[in-house]
């Protein structure tokens, strides 16, 4: 009798262990379901190979190959991929916490029947598209996922990431080191008045014709040392861009002759177009047609001599 009781207890224990073991796959399945944007390859969204977003005004498309991320519309564009990677990381984090709105909301009531914003991401072999509808009073946006029935709410901070244009992701050029040690001549030319100023360095300092202008040149040297482009305005522009930006008849042209690191004299030219209402000039660098924006205070020291 005692042996029978022990056998029964052992059987109960085995059944209990089987029940516990049987629950683990169910929990794992639930966890997988909670990853709303999961894919069959179980890759992280940060491993995506394609990203596209549209906010009804701008469309940005990017693809990744062995050399990194590229802008699909012009793969020669000097793209800083940091913003793309940040967006994918934000999408990955958002996906882990998405839950459908309860009670359910009709697509028409959430602005999803005619969504004006979308984001598409490709991870492995799978492509997922998110569509964004109306924004609620609390700032959140309704979102739907193509191929799924649920409606979700996402933070405004994430949706705002689709408001950034590709030009704001450009790697901006930098000027070579230009100091009193390697500068030899600075030439300023005003397009409007056809006026030219040539500043030449001698052993006694900087001169404009026969008048010493060392102090004025020091201000220009400081401006050159701190000079940075504010943003990219137009990359690989059409021929119409130059007259539209006032670069066909520039406000001023600044040319600096200097001795480079290998001991050869070379030149650098900044061409200033129209002054915009926001206080920035359209600017090009050397023979590159890319148009940049530069605030007027960065070139004030040069224009003061014209």
Indicate where each model-derived feature is located.
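C-terminal motif of bacterial Sec signal peptides marking the signal peptidase cleavage site
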Residues: 16-19
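Core hydrophobic alpha-helical membrane-spanning segments
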Residues: 8-14
């Amino acid at each position: 009798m005692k042996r029978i009781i022990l056998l029964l207890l052992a059987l109960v224990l085995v059944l209990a262990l089987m029940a516990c073991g049987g629950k683990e796959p169910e929990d794992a399945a639930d966890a997988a379901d909670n990853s709303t944007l999961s894919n069959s390859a179980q890759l992280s969204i940060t491993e995506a190979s394609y990203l596209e977003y549209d906010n009804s005004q701008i469309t940005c498309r990017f693809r990744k190959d062995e050399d990194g991320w590229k802008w699909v519309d012009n793969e020669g564009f000097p793209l800083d991929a940091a913003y793309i990677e940040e967006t994918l990381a934000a999408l990955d984090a958002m996906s882990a916490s998405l839950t459908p709105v309860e009670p359910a909301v009709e697509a028409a009531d959430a602005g999803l029947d005619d969504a004006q914003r979308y984001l598409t991401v490709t991870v492995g072999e799978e492509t997922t598209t998110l569509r964004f509808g109306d924004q609620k009073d609390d700032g959140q946006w309704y979102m739907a996922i193509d191929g799924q029935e649920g409606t979700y709410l996402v933070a405004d901070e994430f949706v705002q990431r689709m408001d950034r244009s590709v030009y704001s992701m450009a790697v901006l050029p930098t000027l070579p080191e230009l100091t009193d040690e390697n500068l030899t001549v600075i030439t300023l030319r005003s397009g409007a008045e056809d006026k030219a100023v040539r500043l030449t360095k001698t052993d006694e300092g900087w001169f404009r014709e026969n008048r010493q202008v060392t102090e004025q040149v020091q201000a220009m040297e400081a401006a050159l040392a701190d000079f940075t482009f504010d943003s990219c305005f137009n990359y690989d522009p059409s021929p119409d861009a130059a007259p539209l930006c006032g670069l066909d008849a520039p406000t001023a042209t600044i040319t600096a002759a200097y001795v480079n690191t290998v001991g050869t004299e070379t030149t650098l030219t900044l061409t200033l177009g129209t002054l915009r209402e926001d206080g920035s000039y359209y600017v090009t660098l050397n023979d590159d047609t890319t148009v940049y924006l530069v605030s007027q205070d960065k070139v004030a020291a040069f224009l003061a001599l014209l």
